[in-house]
């Protein structure tokens, strides 16, 4: 059963049954990365600890060899696909408030941060409606999540 449309100050990790994703669905995520963050990620999964992830968006501030990188990927049956890393800028900073919008479209996801288009990620795993869980994990304090 789908829960509330607005969730304020949820704990991290945050796992929520948002109902099926579909073209036109928008997810608004506001938050603040930690003071010395390693990474945080946003995932659309088929179950709370899903073996299938339609989309992961992993903001890596200082993780392994990665510095200020955004990794996008999909996972099928616990196997990750090919990473996408190219973006024109890294919109996050430690302790800096952000507002993110993720729009589900027919062909893929579009992500904007602080009113600026950031990236697109084409759908790899279908059908979309089997992905009902949003997971946010890592070095971030979420102030609000909203679904529309």
Regions found by a protein language model. Give the residues of each.
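Eukaryotic short linear interaction motifs
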Residues: 36-38, 49-52, 108-110, 118-121, ...
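Short, aromatic/His-centered strand-loop micro-motif at the edge of beta-sheets
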Residues: 80-99
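Secretory/extracellular carbohydrate-interaction modules
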Residues: 2-73
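Surface-exposed coil/turn segments at beta-strand junctions on protein surfaces, enriched
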Residues: 22, 93-95, 127
């Amino acid at each position: 059963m789908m829960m509330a449309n607005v969730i304020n100050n949820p704990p991290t990790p945050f796992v929520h049954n948002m109902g099926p994703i579909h073209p036109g669905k928008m997810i608004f995520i506001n938050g603040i990365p930690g003071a010395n963050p390693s990474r945080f990620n946003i995932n659309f999964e088929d179950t709370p600890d899903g073996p299938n992830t339609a989309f992961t968006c992993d903001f890596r501030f200082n993780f392994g060899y990665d510095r200020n990188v955004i990794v996008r990927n999909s996972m099928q049956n616990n196997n990750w696909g090919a990473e996408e890393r190219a973006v024109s800028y890294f919109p996050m900073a430690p302790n800096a408030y952000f507002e993110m919008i993720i729009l589900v479209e027919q062909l893929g996801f579009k992500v904007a941060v602080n009113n600026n288009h950031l990236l697109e990620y084409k759908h790899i795993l279908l059908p979309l409606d089997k992905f009902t869980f949003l997971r946010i994990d890592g070095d971030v304090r979420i102030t609000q999540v909203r679904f529309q």
